[in-house]
Amino acid sequence: MSAETGEKVVELLIPLEMYLQHGVHIGTKMVTNYMKRFVYKRRNIDGLAILDVRKIDQRIRVAAKFLSRFEPEKIMVVSVRQYGHKPVTMFAQFTGAKPVIGRFVPGTLTNPALEVYYEPDVILVTDTRMDQQAIVEAAEIGIPVVAICDTDNKTENVDLIIPGNNKGRKSLALLYWLLTRQVLVERGQLSPDAPEDQPAPVSEFETKVKMV
């Protein structure tokens, strides 16, 4: 309980330092009206918007609880953005979700004649701009959309926003690692007190950059 406000202080899922080290809170210079409520402040040195870590943490809890209500194979997780490919693949591996990485083929959710056609009950997207096709199709067939949204994202047709830096590879690794853990916790498949290397270390969720 906070002595100043009388509000109950909820402990973060992971240490604050871990969020900060992975840059999950670092937004962009642009802030859309949709994302203003998640911004903590602007950084004086460069004008970047800083997301409120407590709101990120709280939305991860809410999203994990929501996703855990669906059959694993009925969850589709999407990332056109390259830095989201490995995190999405790992999330799918441990949760049983259907991963779609790279180009999202138009009609994936709406055209049964396509080989890639799939019928999820919910989709999780990495970036509302990059994954717009998936969001449009989800809205067309009437299924909920959970989205990781940076400060510059628009959120039309998004049912549940997870604020966070969706451009950095370390940030996306941590966000998907934490979502994975929380979904498993909500399903009763992982203890809330499980070590940080379960179900796998966060480093294994990170897209590796090939040196040329």
From Swiss-Prot:
User: Which portions of the sequence form the region Disordered?
Assistant: 190-212
Which keywords has UniProt assigned to this entry? Ribonucleoprotein, Ribosomal protein
A GO cellular component annotated for this chain's UniProt record is: small ribosomal subunit
Which SUPFAM superfamilies does the entry mention?
Ribosomal protein S2
UniProt GO MF annotations: structural constituent of ribosome
BP terms from Gene Ontology: translation
Keyword field contains Ribonucleoprotein:
yes
The record's annotation in InterPro entries points to: Ribosomal_uS2 (IPR001865), Ribosomal_uS2_arc (IPR023454), Ribosomal_uS2_CS (IPR018130), Ribosomal_uS2_euk/arc (IPR005707), Ribosomal_uS2_flav_dom_sf (IPR023591)
Could you say which protein family the record assigns here? Belongs to the universal ribosomal protein uS2 family.
HAMAP family, A to Z:
Ribosomal_uS2_A (MF_00291_A)
Protein name, entry field: Small ribosomal subunit protein uS2
